[in-house]
Design a protein with these regions (language model features):
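Sec-dependent bacterial lipoprotein signal peptides
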Residues: 1-20
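Cross-family detector of peptidyl-prolyl cis-trans isomerase
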Residues: 21-346
């Protein structure tokens, strides 16, 4: 079927080329994409078996959910996949689909992503679709190029430096599932951390809102003084168990994230008088650690083994820490660290 689609769309493109050479480039692309979309819909959804909104968003299917509909100011955890009109997938947050497509990578996170509603940080087409959905629902849409841009007025108002030019020059199909609607992101994270604590570390108190720490073994003597150095081993995870970083070679191999070009050696940490000065925000060099990790280190001494878990404010924040290859930590991720300190070397 995809072969027929490609041939049909190719024919449309050829005819458009001969009759629209005199048009401006942006007008030409808009016209081309409109005709390609029309051809695709005529072939695959004859008889207008789809819905077109006033903005031009195409809704191919909609399975209604039973939960809350997100509104501006909410957060929405979504799973989604993106593909071109000829059926080639370009991105997916679904692990099983990535495996089927042969593009799965253990270094890439597969799970729901948080979309912020009403801040101009998602495309106009995605915003419109999510605001028509309810929690638990699924929708397949086509976002044309003019709806792939961000709402500049909103992201400028909220202080985000986001380009409002279209993010795509072609029509894209989005398969979306609205997993969870969140009115208050940090209340949701607080509740999630408490549930995680109750399951894995019952009885551990939060020493400060959004932060938990438990020493599993070692001494309870004074912490390491300023200007001393400790050798640190760690495993960094999300709360669902996804390992995003470690300096332990065997652990990296176990979770499929081993990189032969990386050096799996102990992290040499120079201690300061406060954990704030050891964090990336407080260190003079700007090369410190995320706040939650720095706070945990400051609570440990030589030979200790401890765990800590905390909300995204003490981690990588709203932007996350995503690498060029797509791996890393998504925005608004709660983090968990398993930390070991070597004994002091004299």
């Amino acid at each position: 079927m995809y072969t027929n689609i490609k041939l049909y769309l190719a024919a449309i493109l050829c005819s458009i080329f001969f009759f629209s050479c005199a048009e401006e480039k942006d007008e030409s692309n808009k016209s081309v994409q409109e005709r390609i979309l029309e051809a695709y819909l005529d072939l695959n959804y004859p008889g207008n078996k789809y819905m077109k909104t006033a903005s031009g968003l195409i809704i191919l299917s909609h399975q209604e959910g039973k939960g809350l509909t997100p509104v501006d100011g909410d957060g929405a955890y979504i799973r989604y996949s993106v593909k071109t009109l000829d059926g080639n997938y370009e991105k997916t947050t679904l692990e099983n689909l990535a495996q089927q497509l042969g593009v799965y990578s253990a270094t890439e996170y597969y799970g729901p992503e948080l979309a912020e509603i009403g801040y101009g940080k998602i495309s106009r087409g995605m915003h419109e679709a999510l605001c028509m959905m309810r929690e638990g629902g699924k929708m397949t849409i086509i976002i044309p190029p003019h709806l792939s841009s961000f709402d500049y007025n909103k992201n400028y108002y909220y202080g985000y430096d986001i380009d409002d030019t279209p993010q795509s020059s072609v029509n894209k199909i989005y398969e979306i599932e609205l997993v969870h609607t969140i009115g208050d992101v940090f209340k949701f994270q607080t509740d999630s951390l408490e549930r995680f604590r109750d399951i894995h570390y019952p009885g551990v108190d939060s020493t400060v809102t959004g932060y938990y720490f438990k020493k599993l073994s070692g001494t309870y003597k004074d912490t390491i003084p300023q200007n001393e150095t400790a050798s640190v081993w760690y495993v960094g995870k999300l709360l669902d168990g996804y390992v995003f970083d470690t300096n332990i070679a065997d652990t990296a191999k176990k979770y499929g994230i081993y990189d032969a070009s990386s050096s799996y050696t102990a992290l040499s940490v120079s201690y300061e008088s406060t954990f704030e000065l050891m964090s990336s925000e407080g260190s003079e060099s700007g090369n410190g650690y995320v706040t939650g990790f720095a706070r945990a280190l400051k609570s440990m001494t030589y030979g200790d083994h401890a765990v800590t878990f905390f909300w995204s404010k003490y981690g990588y924040g709203a932007d996350g820490n995503v690498g060029d290859n797509g791996g890393g930590v998504p925005g608004y991720s709660m983090l968990f660290f398993d930390i070991y300190l070597d004994e002091k070397q004299y």
